[in-house]
Amino acid sequence: MNKWNTIKSLIENKDFEGLQDILHDEYLYLRETTLISKDEMVSFIKKRFEDGLTFEKLELIIENKDLLAWRDVLIEHGGKKWETTNVQLWKDNKVGRDVVSVRDLEKVDRI
């Protein structure tokens, strides 16, 4: 299975054990000013799903031997929507780094 199908399957099936397995031991997640480790990430995602988080519009941007990038819309419990862009750097066939940018879909971007 390729990287994209693996990640989509983990999200769609809420497979936390599979998530734990695919994250490299040196894994780090970076979002704005947040930096978390592998174990913290699994707990964080599990709690978010338990709180009602859902994913929509999963869209592949690029996949190659070193990275995977995609965009999605996250919907929080209560209906708050965020568009996220996710870039994963892979190491030893596992996710080594996640860099995520988030945009509030209720706010108008000024360019």
What kind of feature is each model-predicted range?
Residues 1-3, 24, 65-71:
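Short, hydrophobic/aromatic-rich segments at coil-to-beta transitions
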Residues 12, 35-36, 40-111:
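A beta-strand edge to alpha-helix "cap/lid" segment located at domain peripheries
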